[in-house]
């Protein structure tokens, strides 16, 4: 399920890489709970119980979570987005209950949590974005990034805004790692391993 500037659509994806089958389409642009509930009803989701993959915003709607910048935006754990040491703390309690008016839950869920697939592309984009943003813009590594992506504006590159094909191009560039510091090389290797072995490439 996904929306664009002009429509919202749901497609059925076969696990053996057959063609996508569109199962729902609407010109409504906003991913509201009412719209998604109607789409699920029209495709008779309750009898099929397909696995669902979507971006994190849509997953929040499916799970009945409050939208926007909230204290607990994750549907898997109780990560506190406003915690001062949120990146220092690595383990957060699992979200076991979806009780309305607790931990940013404002409605019942439309899809069981076990039926939601974490969107690997969005995770991959976030990993690479954060890595690129951590680079010093005056470094040799950043200058090499500019050479790899001459058409990307400096602002986009500094913000780490890459798409899927850009990420593939960067991961295939064998010389990029040689411009990184030792610590950055360790982080880069870890990101590549997670990207290839966990998220799939």
How would you name each of these model-derived features?
Residues 1-201:
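A structural signal for the principal folded core domain
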């Amino acid at each position: 399920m996904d929306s664009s500037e002009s429509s919202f659509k749901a497609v059925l994806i076969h696990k053996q890489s057959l063609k996508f089958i569109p199962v729902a389409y609407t010109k409504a642009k906003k991913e509201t709970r009412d719209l998604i509930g109607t789409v699920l009803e029209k495709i008779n989701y309750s009898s099929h119980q397909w696995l669902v993959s979507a971006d994190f915003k849509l997953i929040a709607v499916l799970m009945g979570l409050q939208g926007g910048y909230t204290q607990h935006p994750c549907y898997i754990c109780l990560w506190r987005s406003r915690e001062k040491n949120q990146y220092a703390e690595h383990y957060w309690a699992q979200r076991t209950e979806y009780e309305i008016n607790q931990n940013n839950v404002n409605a019942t869920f439309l899809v069981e949590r076990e039926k939601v697939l974490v969107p690997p592309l969005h995770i991959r984009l976030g990993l690479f974005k954060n890595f690129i943003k951590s680079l010093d813009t005056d470094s040799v590594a950043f200058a090499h990034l500019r050479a790899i992506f001459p058409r990307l504006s400096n602002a986009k590159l500094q913000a780490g805004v890459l798409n899927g094909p850009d990420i593939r191009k960067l991961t295939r560039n064998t010389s990029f790692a040689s411009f990184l510091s030792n610590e950055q090389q360790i982080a880069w290797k870890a990101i590549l391993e997670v990207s290839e072995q966990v998220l799939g490439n």
